[in-house]
Amino acid sequence: MRPEEQLNALRALYSWANEINVDGMAVEVGTFSGENAVVMAKYFNRVVTIDPWLNGYDKDDHASSADMAEVEKKYLERTEPFTNISHIKLPSIEASKQFDDGSIDLVYLDGDHRTEAMVADIDAWKPKVRPGGILAGHDINIESVHNALKQRFMGVVAQIFTDSSWGIII
């Protein structure tokens, strides 16, 4: 479970998005058990979550070794009441190909945190965000995520939220 402080920071991120008219479709890459998706569903008309629920992608990430059948079950239980949440059970890059460029209001990256994977996610998902939309994510305090952001957005001002979430207006 995410601590209440993290959930409050996510609410702040999505409120900020709504204030600048970003409230249509949101995509969450790396939904895990759906806690963030449920928060998103209250701020966006449509939420699409992406997660293949596969093990072993990163030996340094505890989520990579979780019981993914249980995680998926918890996700389904948690999101079932929300008619505006749907799921694509594919790896991030493959799932990104199902969206037209400029078609998404907000993308939240919280999947594979290795630098090369984050760079690939940024490269795949940034074109999908509409002009004026937001590319955001979690764990800017993790060195690999921070390095990926520096590689792709050096010199760009990002909004940082208290739980280490970040957001950039595209």
Regions found by a protein language model. Give the residues of each.
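S-adenosylmethionine/decaboxylated-SAM
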Residues: 3-4, 11-170
